[in-house]
Each structure stands twice: as structure tokens, then as C-alpha cells.
């Protein structure tokens, strides 16, 4: 510190404090800036003593000046500070830092010529002379010479690494020290680092990767002329295969210089940043202030982590402004928010200096006392005198008691009293409030009879003075009273028992002592000499002080010091105090205090103490199923990264008591693995408990559904809280714990795996939900009984408390519940505690008088997939409980059939209209109301034109909830049946939510309802209801009879269809010899059956018996449909209405039943057969002649794609193997080419899908890597892209584009040198694009608009090429075809696992095996050698080919694999 203190003295120090940091700013230089600058000089190998003179500062500036343009912010701040110190030494008058810099520049140029302007680029440019800068390469006499790095520089680098251990400061330090260095110099710096070889290895790996990437991007152009300097390779840049002379020539040659030094520095910086992240794994988002942590300590940790973050300054600025306040503890956050927007760091540190734990408060108290007692502070640290040592033994200054040679004095060295030593001295105890004579006025104040002064720890008797024996006697009495506890409350809490010296006397052992929850301030009413006072019980205060009472004139004046300052008080002794019906006598002070406080002197006299109640949740006994044993599955291998993550998780859980180590006698094991969480930064441990779930006894879900806000009674106050770590708070029964054992393996089996068992409910185990629900019910049941007027709704870990109590009483109940849960080991996080509306609960927003759904925003998309529609329908169904009129019928029709989740959906006009109507409905906010038991509950049902039923459940005009019903299970339905289903749904819903049946308002006439209900009462359950008729439904009835009609004609109907040609027949035969057949086209089996039934109805009389063999037709007729979406069913309904009586019966098909057998033969002739078998031989001949492709064969001959592909695969001429022919363009589905072109002074970036010719383009502001990367991200978010081909432009080879390509998973390739056609597709498309723009240029003003218009024309208005399609159609067709091919290949791979043995003709010998190609209804396709044969099914045996058995473990123990015998 000597050099630092002597840098500036006297007037120079005063002059420093007049200079502003910034022009026009408020802040000025302080002595701390000099100290900081002296510390920083050591990093650059510069002595601190250089700051003491003008010449020394000039030497420092000579070293720092060349590094300023490319240096870090710390380097620039150091340079600025030295400039100011130089000006003070030179007696130059300056006002701010900028003025000092200008003067220094001017003087250095005039005197030494060394402060010339630095280059604006980061590429090293050697100065013009030896004195030109701190460069290893100097320009002397027109030649560049290399000067090795000085030992001082190397020493500074080594010291930086050793001190900071690869902290965040290493990267800017390396940048500053290696400025202008060659690869040789940089390697010399790396070789100086002796330790940290792991970090050095990481840097070497980065160098190897970057060198290989350099070689790929910069291929060797070819042979060079003799004497010409070769181009550098990656190893040359790394300095392993190049000399210093070659490196200097590459760096400073006139034509195309290659800054190998800067390139190598960038590689090293990438490696150093990786090491910094490894050595500093703490994320800045995890830096949070502890509850008692001083704010300054938290800020230090925050900025240390911030320096390790490799991000933009703008992002760091945002982190500083947002995260610093957001992650502070609640006390500091409250203080910081009061400072307004964007406070400075100095303001925040000043405001929060009083917030912290006891240690922080003690330090601040000491500082406050020092300012009051001690002499006035001297302005500068250099002028302050060191405090003299004083010996406690002899009283002399200059040495300590340990060094004292005088005889040892008996008694305490602190207070001088005998009977105890200094470590036990009561005067050493520090308190939050302390009394005693302070400052200069203290001797003038009246003193008490004791010469020892005020007692800071009053004894229970209230005496502030006395002998040592009395003090110890009182202390022992108090401690003994604290140790004697009594049993309190039914949860086993303990409370202190008072000592026997109180007026009231000792309490009985059977009584429970008072308890104070710490969720709010412990404030009680005390009576001081009969005067009531509200006081705070403060265990952190030594003494007691109150305001607003009069206790007479028998007092002693005292000064009390605290965080808030110092106040004058009156001290009264032996005052009678009554608290909670208990009386004591103690010392108390009165004064102007902001809050009345009872400190430890009164609390100990009352026998109070702090107690931590520990309650217990009894575990539930669980058994395995009879005859079952626990899982004994092997742990599969895991990656090293996952093993380390699991170890960290398990160690944390073991410390928290959730896991314990399994004994070696435990035979059970369950596989464990890890997955990344959503933020991709943390890991989640998963245990595969499927096998344990199989053998564990069954459980019943106690909670059958989710509570609904419409079922809540209307209450004045609501509070919502959450139970944290729900499962991990409940113990698992000890007898069951061994079955949960799992193992953490080690890499390469380096050590035995560590085994754990669960002590709490595991996640993923089937018993955890039921046990948690049962436990929560047991925990809350006594609380519910004790507070019957309070509503407590609990679903899993969400708890809602509602009551009509006053605010104080309601808050008290909530705090009691939190205390109960916390006492049982459950946590209730403050961040999820909701005290004020709106309350976010179970997806709802709750208010005291109403409830809403949380904000619903329907997405806006250009392209919708099946998964998007599913999510949309789910959101709309959720909204339908409050928003009347929500419809999803046509939206659901968009995803009918077998569709993949990612398949694009084609919208219909009806669906678009339905979605827009729903958007309008959701834009009008709706409110639901709470249930009032005394009012009538009503349900009104309505039906719209589209057969959708809506209902609302209300009390008078207040709607509780609404709903819709559109579950039409069949295409053909009956309105009365649907109405019954609606009533059933409402009835069940009302019973669950309110426990009562509402009064219904239904749109049907009573007579029609009762007529239908008499026949179909068994269809479903309908609750009792009061009938209120609204405008009725129209109901059509037809007379179906239950027995055959004697004398009526009987019709046997049947229909058939060929699946391939879609041709079919429908017909009937009668018992009177009539028959009729009708040919059908583009039909199905079901449609043919319905046609036959309709023909029978049309051709029969008023009474008829119809026999069908189709359950489909039978079901439709029996349900008496009144409406249908099918034209043929509507025709059947019309015909059935005309009949007087109809009897419909069903018989099984193909069973030889008379009538049915005849009509079956009638309609099956020429229809039910395999139509494509006879087309295989012509297809083979066609391919042998013309070598047609798969699509042509399938299209022309109507054979399946799989058969056509097998024909092509069997042709030797049509198979191409090996690599693609050199020079051909890669036309795979995911291949795109990208290039930039120019038009009208604008830059247009163009991307072309090679296979289809589809084009994407837009105008970008500059041809940079960032803009190119953004365009690539847009492209990849719209279309599948796996391979990107570009030229070698700087924007395409930039780090931004590489990073995007890596993140998306794109293979990137570049143009081949001397082959401009390697990206010829996009080059040609640039030409076509410009031609198209020229044709339509008049239609738009800006080039941005006309580019997009031209793209539309080229993608959608240009047909031709492959398939005679537009590029957009071709691209979509290719994507769809690729999906179909993948499906067929998967199907084909399954068929290849089977072998066929067959017989041909009359030959009884079995032949084969052959390869199964196709399995039809009547025959199979078999490949034998090169022949494809058609074998009838009756002459073929299909056997699975399992291959040869392998003598090895059949179970797969790889990560994620399933074991047939062990896992479901």
C-alpha cells in the first residue's frame, strides 16, 4: 500500500477530486480510483511506483496506448485514469477525463512522437519504427523484424492465469497481452502455463477443429510458381508447420495479407471462453441474493458471473438493469423499487447497506459508533493514522497482551472484573440496540449508583448492576427455566416454562404455553405499571424501549444507538410488566422510538425462547401383489454427461434426506436415466418404474376430478397457495423402500456403481398420487373441522382458501394453515402465494365476486398441421365452459381419417368461417358467477341449425357456467336421443359440481318425449327433472315392429364392393322368387348394403319383412334416425315413413342361410376377387421393353406400388450403385442453393430448392453474416432443409451462418474452385428472377415489393418441368411422396422378415423358402430367385424367419431399449 498511498498527496489529491469522470457529469474522481489503477498495473507487468511521477505515467501510457483501440473496457478505464494522474503531475488544469486525454495526446506527440493515431481495424499493422508500439514485429529500415515477447509480458500472463484460475478476466487479459503477436509468440504464451493442462487440452482441441475447418474452407489452389509464398494452412496458422518469417510475410505482404496472428488469437479466445464456462459453471440466472446476505456481497457475485457471460454489451446492460433487482431478496427488492427507474449502482449499494444478517448489522453498528465516538475522519486514507495497540494486561500502548512481559493480571481483560475470563464477559455480547454513555456529552449526564455503567444484558430481577455471583445466579436460573419445557398442543410443539421468581408463580405442567407464528410480526399487548402498550417481541434486541407512557421521575438518562440513529431515553428499573397474564419486574426505557420493543432482558424473564416445531407424517404401509417380487433389472449404460448429472442430483437429494444409500444386501434394481429440461441447461432424473408398478398393489385415485370455480360459494376473501416439492415431502414406508433401489454406473466400470433407495414418494411410481391425496386429506381434515365457515379447495398441490371473515381474521387462518403445512415438512413458496386478486388458479382467474378464464389467444398461422388443429380444438373446448356459442364441428372435420400429427391441413370455407366466429366470441370477455345455495339452479338447453346443442346453468340472470354438446357418435342420429344425452351430461355435471339437479328448460313436447322414453328408457340414465317446454323440435316417427309380419313379403338384401376398382353391386331376393341387382361405381361395402336396403324399401308394399346381413344397416334402422348427412340414409328415412309396418332382422353372412346365400352369390359375381394379379406379368414385360419406373407401372397397370417397386428392383439395368457422377447437381429433397445478387443498388438474397425449382428471396440491408443467418432461419422454419450449397462469400462462411446451420442440423457445402457451375441452379434462378422483375416492374414502386411479387409469379404461375406442375405444387408433392415412401419402406421391411413354403399344381412336395412380397386375401406374391410367383393362400405356408440363434444375452441393455420380458 505504500506506493498507492504516495501517488498523490496534499493539493494533488484535492485536485484529483475536482476532476469529473465524464464531461458534464456529477461523479468525480476519488482515491479509490488510484488504488484500483495501481492494482490493475500488475496485470501488465508494470510497477505501481510508476504512478508517482510524470515520467512514470508517461512510460505507462507508452505501453497502454497501442492496446486501447482493441482493448477491453477495463483497459480503457486504466488508460483514462493514468492520463488524469499524468495531468495532475504535470500541473495541467483539466475538468474531466476527455480533457485529460486530449492534453496527453498532444504532449506525447510533441515530446516523443509516440501517440500517433492507432489503426481502426483489428488487423495488426506494424508501426513505422521501433518506438512505435508494443508489437513483437517492428518495421526497421523497410524490413519487418521479430522481437520476442519480453519476460515481463509472459510473467503478467502466467500471473493472470494463476490468480484468476480461468476466470472471466482471462479472456480480455489475453486479448490485451497478445495484441499484434504472431502464432509463434502466442504458442510461447501457452507453453508458459505449467498447470491447468486440462484447460490447455481443451484449447488444443479447439485449435485442431478450427484448423481443419480452415483447410476445408480454403482448399489448396494448385501448384505454385517457384519462389512464390504458399498460402497458409490450418497448421501454419497454429504455428506448428510454419516459421516466424513466413508468419510475418503472410501478415504484412502488400497483396492479400492473411492476419494469421489475429486468426490464431480468435481460435485461442474461443478455447478460453469454453474454459471460462467450464471453470465458472454458475449461470447468471442462478445468482440470487440469500435471505440474510448483504447486498454488496450479492452484487460482487453477480458481476463476477456477468463477466463470465460471453454476450453483447447490450444484453449485459439489460441483465444489470433487470436481473440485479429481480433476483434480490424481498427486503432489498422493496428498497430498490423505491429508487425509481434505472438507479445507479452506487445508489443501490447505499440504499441497501442496512439490509442483511446480524453480521452485516454489527459491522454497520460499529461504523456508526466509530463516527460518533471517534475523531473526525481525515479526508484521505494516506493521511489517516493507524490505531495504536494497547495491552489489556498492563495498560500500556505499543504491544498486545500476548507480547506483554508483565505478570499476568487476574480477572477479565475486557471489563477488569474478577471471576470470569474475557471470552465469557457479558460486555462482549453485541445487540441490535445498545445503551451506554456515548460521545462528548456522556460525562455530563447523571450516572447511576453503579460505577460499571449501564448494563446491556439486564438480569431477570431487573437489576443493572451487582456482583459477579448475582449475575451468574440469575443467568443459571434463566437457562434452567428455558430448559424445562412442557408439552404444548396436539402436534407435539414445546413451549418454555417460566422460572419460579415471577409474581404469578410456576405454571402447571399440563398447560400449553402461548405460541407465536413468525409469518407476521409477534406483537402483543403488555401492561406496564397498568398502562396497556402494543409491543414487538424482538429476540435480536438486548434491551426494551417503549414510547407514550409515563413512569415518574425516578429514571436515569441514557442514549440508545441503533441502525436508525441515536435517541435519548429514560431508564426505569424494577418496573412491573404483565404479558399474557404473566407478571415480571425488569428494567425498561421510554423514549421516541418508532416501534415499542421488548428485548431479551424481559423475554428471558418471561421464560420465552425460540422453538422449532418438528411434526411428523406417518407413512402408509404398501405391499407388493401376492406372489410378486421387486424389480431386478440391469442398469443400462449411460453417457458420461448423464452420469455426472445424475450424481449431482442424487447427492443433493441425499443431503435433503430424500435418498439414502442402499445396503449391499439389497437385490433389487430399477434402471435410471436423465433427460434435459425445457431450458436445455439442467437435467431431470427419471426412474423407469414400469416393472415396479406392475408388481405393486393397486391404488384408487381418491380425487375423481378437477374442482370448478362455478361450484365455489361466493365469499368475501380468497387466498391461493401452492405446496412445493409435494411428493418429496411425504415419507415412503420403510418396508417398501428397498424395492425403489437404483444404481448410478461409472464410465468404463472404473468403480462399483453407487446405489440409492428412496425415502420419500418417488415420481413415476403409481402409488405416489393416491398417497399424496390421502395424506393431504388427513392433514387438512382437522383444519376444516376447526374452521367450518372457511372453504378449502385442494387439488394436488394447489390450495384455495375462501371465507367471509374480516381481512385480519382471514389472513390469520391462512397463516395458521401455512404454519400447519410447514410444521409437517411441506413448503409453501412465497413466489406462488397469492393474496390479492386476480388469483390464478387451475387455469382460471378468480375475483371475490366473479371468475373468468385466463386470457385465451387463438394462434394466427399461415400453415396449420393436424397437431395445431388438435390444440386449437382443445383450447376452444376449454373456452366453451364460459363463452356460449363456441363451435368446433367443422374444425374437427378437417382432421378426420388417418393423418400424421405434422401433416398440413387444407382448410374449408366452413371451417374458416367457424374459426372467425369463435374469434369474435372470444373477443367479448365473459364472466362467470359463484354459486348461491339459497337460489334456484336452472339449466336451459338450445339447439342451433347445425345440430349442435348448447346449454347454460344459471341462477336467475347470473350465469354459473355454459357448455356445448356435439357428440354425434353416428352420422345418422335421432334428436330425442341426443337430447337425452345432453340432459344426462348436464345432470351428472350438476351433481358433481353442486350436488343437486337443476330445473331443466328443454325444447321438446312432453307427449313426444314420453312416447320415446317408454321404449328406450334403458338407453341411458336421465335425472329427475321439472319439465318446462320451449319451442319444440320436429320429430318424425316410423313404425318399426318387433315381430315378423305374417303374410308380408320377405326381402333378403346384400351388397358387395371391390376395394381396388371401387366397383360394386347391390340387390335383393324375395321369398316369392323376385330378385334385382344394381351395379354401383365409386362405392364402398357399407354404401352397397344401404343401396340394397333402400331398393327393398322402394320395391316393397306398405308392410314388409327385410333380412340383412350387415350390422351397420341394422344399427341405422333400429336407431330410428330423423336426420343424416348421408343422401342414401335420408332416402331410407323417407321410405320408412311411408310404411305402415316394417320388420328388420339380421342374420350372419356367409353361413349358408337360405335367401341370404342366394343374394350373396348374386351380388358377388365378378366383384370379390384380387383384380391386380393378372396384371403382374404384363407389367414385367412392359418393364423389360421400356424400363418404366415405379410410378408408370403402378399408374398404367393398377398394381400396388410395392409390387411395382419389386419389379424395378429386380432389373439389373435399373439399379445404380456407388457415388453420384462427378459434376451432377445434388437434387435430394432437402437440398437448397443460396446466393446474393444485386439490382437497382439493392442486395437480394435468393434460395432455390434444387429438386423443384421453388424459390425464396427477399431484400436485405447488407450482405452480412447476421442477415444471411436470419434469412436461413426463416427458410428452415418454413421448409425442410438438410443441405445448403453456397459460394465462398464472406457472409456464407461467417460464424453466424455456421452457428445457425449447426443448430438446425444443416450440412453446409461451398462452391468448388474453378467450377462456377457448382451452384448453377441458383445462378440461373437469379437470371430468371431479374427477367421476371423486368416484366412486372411497373406494377410496384419499391424493389422490396416487386421482388416478392416476382417470387409469387415464379412459384405459382409457372407450370412445366417434372410432373407438369408449378414449383410450389412440385415441392409439396415431393414432401408428401417422401412421407409415403418412408411408410411403404417400413411396411416392406416387415414383409421381408417372412418366408413362404408353397406347392405348385398337383405336385405334393413343398418348395421354398421364397421371399414374401405381398399378402392378399386369396393369394400371396412370392419371390423365388429372380421369379415372382402367385401362390393361392391354400397352397402356401408363411413362416417368420428368425435367423440363426446367437449365443449371447438376448436382452438389450442399451439406453432407452425395451426388454420384452421385463418392460411393457
From Swiss-Prot:
Lipid conjugation (N-myristoyl glycine) is at: 2
Compositional bias annotation for Low complexity = 456-469
Site (Cis/trans isomerization of proline peptide bond) at: 222-223
Example GO molecular function:
structural molecule activity
Write out the residue ranges of the motif Nuclear localization signal.
26-32
Protein's UniProt name: Gag-Pol polyprotein
Q: The Reverse transcriptase domain covers which part of the protein? A: 656-846
Q: Does the keyword Manganese apply?
A: no
Q: How is its activity regulated?
A: Protease: The viral protease is inhibited by many synthetic protease inhibitors (PIs), such as amprenavir, atazanavir, indinavir, loprinavir, nelfinavir, ritonavir and saquinavir. Use of protease inhibitors in tritherapy regimens permit more ambitious therapeutic strategies. Reverse transcriptase/ribonuclease H: RT can be inhibited either by nucleoside RT inhibitors (NRTIs) or by non nucleoside RT inhibitors (NNRTIs).
Task: Give the co-factor note.
Answer: Binds 2 magnesium ions for reverse transcriptase polymerase activity.
**Where does motif Nuclear export signal map?**
16-22
Keyword Hydrolase: yes or no? Answer: yes
List the residues marked with site Essential for RT p66/p51 heterodimerization. Answer: 1012, 1025
Instruction: Give the binding site residues for Mg(2+) 2.
Output: 1054, 1089, 1109, 1160
Q: Which residue spans match zinc fingers labelled CCHC-type?
A: 389-406, 410-427
The UniProt entry's GO biological process terms, in alphabetical order, are:
DNA integration; DNA recombination; establishment of integrated proviral latency; proteolysis; symbiont entry into host cell; symbiont-mediated suppression of host gene expression; viral genome integration into host DNA; viral penetration into host nucleus
Tell me the PROSITE patterns matching this sequence.
Answer: ASP_PROT_RETROV (PS50175), ASP_PROTEASE (PS00141), INTEGRASE (PS50994), INTEGRASE_DBD (PS51027), RNASE_H_1 (PS50879), RT_POL (PS50878), ZF_CCHC (PS50158), ZF_INTEGRASE (PS50876)
**Integrase catalytic domain residues:** 1224-1375
Enzyme Commission code: 3.4.23.47, 2.7.7.49, 2.7.7.7, 3.1.26.13
Q: Which residues form the Peptidase A2 domain?
A: 533-602
Amino acid at each position: 500500500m505504500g506506493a498507492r498511498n504516495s501517488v498523490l498527496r496534499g493539493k494533488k489529491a484535492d485536485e484529483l477530486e475536482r476532476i469529473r469522470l465524464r464531461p458534464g457529469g456529477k461523479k468525480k474522481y476519488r482515491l479509490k480510483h488510484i488504488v484500483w489503477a495501481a492494482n490493475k498495473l500488475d496485470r501488465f507487468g508494470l510497477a505501481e511506483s510508476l504512478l508517482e511521477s510524470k515520467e512514470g505515467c508517461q512510460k505507462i501510457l507508452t505501453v497502454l496506448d497501442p492496446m486501447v483501440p482493441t482493448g477491453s473496457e477495463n483497459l480503457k478505464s486504466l488508460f483514462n485514469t493514468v492520463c488524469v494522474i499524468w495531468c495532475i503531475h504535470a500541473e495541467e488544469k483539466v475538468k474531466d477525463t476527455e480533457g485529460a486525454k486530449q492534453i496527453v495526446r498532444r504532449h506525447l506527440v510533441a515530446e516523443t512522437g509516440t501517440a500517433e493515431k492507432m489503426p481502426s481495424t483489428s488487423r495488426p499493422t506494424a508501426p513505422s519504427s521501433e518506438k512505435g508500439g508494443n508489437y513483437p514485429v517492428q518495421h526497421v529500415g523497410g524490413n519487418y523484424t521479430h522481437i520476442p515477447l519480453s519476460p515481463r509480458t509472459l510473467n503478467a500472463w502466467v500471473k493472470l492465469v494463476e490468480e484468476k484460475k480461468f476466470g472471466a478476466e482471462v479472456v480480455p487479459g489475453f486479448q490485451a497481452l497478445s495484441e499484434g503477436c504472431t502464432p509463434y509468440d502466442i504458442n510461447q504464451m501457452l507453453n508458459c502455463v505449467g498447470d491447468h493442462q486440462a484447460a490447455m487440452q481443451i484449447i488444443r482441441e479447439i485449435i485442431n477443429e478450427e484448423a481443419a475447418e480452415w483447410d476445408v474452407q480454403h482448399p489448396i489452389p494448385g501448384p505454385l510458381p517457384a519462389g512464390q509464398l504458399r498460402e497458409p494452412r490450418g497448421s501454419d496458422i497454429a504455428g506448428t508447420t510454419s516459421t516466424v518469417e513466413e508468419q510475418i510475410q503472410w501478415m504484412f505482404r502488400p497483396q492479400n495479407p492473411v492476419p494469421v496472428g489475429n486468426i490464431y488469437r480468435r481460435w485461442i479466445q474461443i478455447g478460453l471462453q469454453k474454459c471460462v464456462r467450464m471453470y465458472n459453471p454458475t449461470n447468471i440466472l442462478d445468482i440470487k441474493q440469500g435471505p440474510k446476505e448483504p447486498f454488496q456481497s450479492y452484487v460482487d457475485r453477480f458481476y463476477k458471473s456477468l463477466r463470465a457471460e460471453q454476450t453483447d454489451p447490450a444484453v449485459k446492460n439489460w441483465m444489470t438493469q433487470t436481473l440485479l433487482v429481480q433476483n434480490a431478496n424481498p427486503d432489498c427488492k422493496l428498497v430498490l423499487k423505491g429508487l425509481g427507474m434505472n438507479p445507479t449502482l452506487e445508489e443501490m449499494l447505499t440504499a441497501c447497506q442496512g439490509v442483511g444478517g446480524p453480521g452485516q448489522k454489527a459491522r454497520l453498528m460499529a461504523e456508526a459508533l466509530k463516527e460518533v465516538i471517534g475523531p473526525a475522519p481525515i479526508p484521505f486514507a494516506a493521511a489517516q493514522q493507524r490505531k495504536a495497540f494497547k495491552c489489556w494486561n498492563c495498560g500500556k500502548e505499543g504491544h498486545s497482551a500476548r507480547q506483554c512481559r508483565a505478570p499476568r493480571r487476574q480477572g477479565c481483560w475486557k471489563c477488569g472484573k474478577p471471576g470470569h475470563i474475557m471470552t465469557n464477559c457479558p460486555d462482549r455480547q453485541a445487540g441490535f440496540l445498545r445503551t451506554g454513555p456515548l460521545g462528548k456529552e456522556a460525562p455530563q449526564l447523571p450516572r447511576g449508583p453503579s460505577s460499571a455503567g449501564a448494563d446491556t444484558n439486564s438480569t431477570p430481577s431487573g437489576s443493572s448492576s451487582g456482583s459477579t455471583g448475582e449475575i451468574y445466579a440469575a443467568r443459571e436460573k434463566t437457562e434452567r427455566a428455558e430448559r424445562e419445557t412442557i408439552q404444548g398442543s396436539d402436534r407435539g410443539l414445546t413451549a418454555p416454562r417460566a422460572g419460579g421468581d415471577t409474581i404469578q408463580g410456576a405454571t402447571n405442567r399440563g398447560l400449553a404455553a402461548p405460541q407465536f407464528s413468525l409469518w407476521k410480526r409477534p406483537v402483543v399487548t403488555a401492561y406496564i405499571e397498568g398502562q396497556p402498550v402494543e409491543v414487538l417481541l424482538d429476540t435480536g434486541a438486548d434491551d426494551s424501549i417503549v414510547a407514550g407512557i409515563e413512569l415518574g421521575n425516578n429514571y436515569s438518562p441514557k442514549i440508545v444507538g441503533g441502525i436508525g440513529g441515536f435517541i435519548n431515553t429514560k431508564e426505569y428499573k424494577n418496573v412491573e410488566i404483565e404479558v399474557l397474564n404473566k407478571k415480571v419486574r425488569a428494567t425498561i426505557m421510554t423514549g421516541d422510538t418508532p416501534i415499542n420493543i421488548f428485548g431479551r432482558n424481559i423475554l428471558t424473564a418471561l421464560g420465552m425462547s425460540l422453538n422449532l416445531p418438528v411434526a411428523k407424517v406417518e407413512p402408509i404401509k404398501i405391499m407388493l401383489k401376492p406372489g410378486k417380487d421387486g424389480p431386478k433389472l440391469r442398469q443400462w449404460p449411460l453417457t458420461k454427461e448423464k452420469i455426472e448429472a445424475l450424481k449431482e442430483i442424487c447427492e443433493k437429494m441425499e443431503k435433503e434426506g430424500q435418498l439414502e444409500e442402499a445396503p449391499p444386501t439389497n437385490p433389487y434394481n430399477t434402471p435410471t436415466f436423465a433427460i434435459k429440461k425445457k431450458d436445455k441447461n439442467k437435467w431431470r432424473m427419471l426412474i423407469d418404474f414400469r416393472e415396479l408398478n406392475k408388481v405393486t398393489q393397486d391404488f384408487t385415485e381418491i380425487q375423481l376430478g378437477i374442482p370448478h370455480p362455478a361450484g365455489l360459494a361466493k365469499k368475501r376473501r380468497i387466498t391461493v397457495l401452492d405446496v412445493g416439492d409435494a411428493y418429496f415431502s411425504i415419507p415412503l414406508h420403510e418396508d417398501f423402500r428397498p424395492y425403489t433401489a437404483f444404481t448410478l454406473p461409472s464410465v468404463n466400470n472404473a468403480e462399483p456403481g453407487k446405489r440409492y433407495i428412496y425415502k420419500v414418494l418417488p415420481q413415476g411410481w403409481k402409488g405416489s398420487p393416491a398417497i399424496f391425496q390421502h395424506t393431504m386429506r388427513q392433514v387438512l381434515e382437522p383444519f376444516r373441522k376447526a374452521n367450518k365457515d372457511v372453504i378449502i379447495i385442494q387439488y394436488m398441490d394447489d390450495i384455495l382458501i375462501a371465507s367471509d371473515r374480516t381481512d385480519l381474521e382471514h389472513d390469520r387462518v391462512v397463516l395458521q394453515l401455512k404454519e400447519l403445512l410447514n410444521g409437517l415438512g411441506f413448503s409453501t413458496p412465497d413466489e406462488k402465494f397469492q393474496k390479492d386478486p386476480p388469483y390464478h388458479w387451475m387455469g382460471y382467474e378468480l375475483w371475490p365476486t366473479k371468475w373468468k378464464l385466463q386470457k385465451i389467444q387463438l394462434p394466427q398461422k399461415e400453415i396449420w398441421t393436424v397437431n395445431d388443429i388438435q390444440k386449437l380444438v382443445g383450447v376452444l373446448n376449454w373456452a366453451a365452459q364460459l363463452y356460449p356459442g363456441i363451435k368446433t364441428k367443422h374444425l374437427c372435420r378437417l382432421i378426420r381419417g388417418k393423418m400424421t400429427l405434422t401433416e398440413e391441413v387444407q382448410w374449408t370455407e366452413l371451417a374458416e368461417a367457424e374459426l372467425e366466429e369463435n374469434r369474435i366470441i372470444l373477443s367479448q370477455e365473459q364472466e362467470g358467477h359463484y354459486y348461491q345455495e339459497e337460489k334456484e339452479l336452472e339449466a336451459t338447453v338450445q339447439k342451433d341449425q347445425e345440430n349442435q346443442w348448447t346449454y347454460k346453468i344459471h341462477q336467475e340472470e347470473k350465469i354459473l357456467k355454459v357448455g356445448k354438446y356435439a357428440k354425434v357418435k353416428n352420422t345418422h342420429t335421432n334428436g330425442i336421443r341426443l337430447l337425452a344425452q345432453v340432459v344426462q351430461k348436464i345432470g351428472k355435471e350438476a351433481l358433481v359440481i353442486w350436488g343437486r339437479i337443476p330445473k331443466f328448460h328443454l325444447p321438446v313436447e312432453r307427449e313426444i318425449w314420453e312416447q320415446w322414453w317408454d321404449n328406450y328408457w334403458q338407453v341411458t340414465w336421465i335425472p329427475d327433472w321439472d319439465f318446462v317446454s320451449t319451442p319444440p323440435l320436429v320429430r318424425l316417427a316410423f313404425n318399426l315392429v318387433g315381430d315378423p309380419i305374417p303374410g308380408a313379403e320377405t326381402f333378403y338384401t346384400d351388397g358387395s364392393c371391390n376395394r381396388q376398382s371401387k366397383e360394386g353391386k347391390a340387390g335383393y331376393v324375395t321369398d316369392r322368387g323376385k330378385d334385382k341387382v344394381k351395379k354401383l361405381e365409386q362405392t364402398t361395402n357399407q354404401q352397397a348394403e344401404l343401396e340394397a336396403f333402400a331398393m327393398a324399401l322402394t320395391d316393397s308394399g306398405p308392410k314388409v319383412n327385410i333380412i340383412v346381413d350387415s350390422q351397420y344397416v341394422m344399427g341405422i334402422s333400429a336407431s330410428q334416425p330423423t336426420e343424416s348427412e348421408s343422401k342414401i340414409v335420408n332416402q331410407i328415412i323417407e321410405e320408412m315413413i311411408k310404411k305402415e309396418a316394417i320388420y328388420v332382422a339380421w342374420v350372419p353372412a356367409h353361413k349358408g342361410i337360405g335367401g341370404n346365400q342366394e343374394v350373396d352369390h348374386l351380388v358377388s359375381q365378378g366383384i370379390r376377387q384380387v383384380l391386380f394379379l393378372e396384371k403382374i406379368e404384363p407389367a414385367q414385360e412392359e418393364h423389360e421393353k421400356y424400363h418404366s419406373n415405379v410410378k408408370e407401372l403402378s399408374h398404367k397397370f393398377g398394381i400396388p406400388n410395392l409390387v411395382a417397386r419389386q419389379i424395378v428392383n429386380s432389373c439389373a439395368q435399373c439399379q445404380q450403385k456407388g457415388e453420384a457422377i462427378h459434376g451432377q447437381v445434388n437434387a435430394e429433397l432437402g437440398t437448397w442453393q443460396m446466393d446474393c445478387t444485386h439490382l437497382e443498388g439493392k442486395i437480394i438474397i435468393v434460395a432455390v430448392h434444387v429438386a423443384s425449382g421453388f424459390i425464396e428471396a427477399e431484400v436485405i440491408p447488407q450482405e452480412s453474416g447476421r442477415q444471411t443467418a436470419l434469412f436461413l432461419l426463416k427458410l428452415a422454419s418454413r421448409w425442410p432443409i438438410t443441405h445448403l450449397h453456397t459460394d465462398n462469400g464472406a457472409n456464407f462462411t461467417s460464424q453466424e451462418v455456421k452457428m445457425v446451420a449447426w443448430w438446425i442440423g444443416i450440412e453446409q457445402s461451398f462452391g468448388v474452385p474453378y467450377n462456377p457451375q457448382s451452384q448453377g441452379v441458383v445462378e440461373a434462378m437469379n437470371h430468371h428472377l431479374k427477367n421476371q422483375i423486368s416484366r412486372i416492374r411497373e406494377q410496384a414502386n419499391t424493389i422490396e415489393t416487386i421482388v416478392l411479387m416476382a417470387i409469387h409469379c415464379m412459384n405459382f404461375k409457372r407450370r412445366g418441368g417434372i410432373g407438369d406442375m408449378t414449383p410450389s405444387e412440385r415441392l409439396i408433392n415431393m414432401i408428401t411422396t417422401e412421407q409415403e415412401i418412408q411408410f411403404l419402406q417400413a411396411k416392406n421391411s416387415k414383409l421381408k422378415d417372412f418366408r413362404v413354403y408353397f406347392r405348385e399344381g398337383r405336385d405334393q412336395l413343398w418348395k421354398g423358402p421364397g421371399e414374401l412380397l405381398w399378402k392378399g386375401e386369396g393369394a400371396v406374391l412370392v419371390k423365388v430367385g429372380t421369379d415372382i410367383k402367385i401362390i393361392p393362400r391354400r397352397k402356401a405356408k408363411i413362416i417368420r424367419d428368425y435367423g440363426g440363434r446367437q449365443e449371447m444375452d438376448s436382452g438389450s441393455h442399451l439406453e432407452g431399449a425395451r426388454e420384452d420380458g421385463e418392460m411393457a
